[in-house]
Amino acid sequence: MIADGMRAVLALGLFIGCSRPPNNNARADSSFAALQQRGETAMGVDQYTSQHIFEPLADGGRVVLQRKETDPAGEATIRAHMRTIAAAFSRGDFALPGFVHATSEVPGTETMKRLRSEITYSPRDLPGGGEVVIYSKNPEAVTAIHEFLAFQRMDHRAGMH
């Protein structure tokens, strides 16, 4: 009886150990592919051939978007997008991240809206694209900015630098 139980456990372990690994291909992940498509619609550039960075800083953070390949038209599109979101975020308008992430509540944005007069958004051109540097002296705003960046980083499967 115990031997039969051990055989069953071993068989199950062998089955689990030999099963196929999870598919880590981002294009095959339908929810991520949908996010990427919405991102391309919102930002105007192919998300698979662009790099996102969402970096927290002691006094805020930065959002970076750059082309992975030389693409002057794409770089100009990114720079225009960065200016657009900096202006929108300054007004407390976070509709674009809501659209891209298919949610009405992007973490951190309610506080960022409420404290918008204490947060600055500075778009800057970078080689291959651009960035928005987000700055505040208000600790509550900085915490919200970090929540916003952490969510973005996770959902976009992006890095910090």
Can you name each region flagged by the protein language model?
Residues 3-11:
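Sec-dependent signal peptide recognition
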Residues 11-19:
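Hydrophobic h-region of N-terminal signal peptides that target proteins for export
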Residues 18-161:
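Intrinsically disordered, low-complexity terminal tails/loops enriched in metal-binding residues
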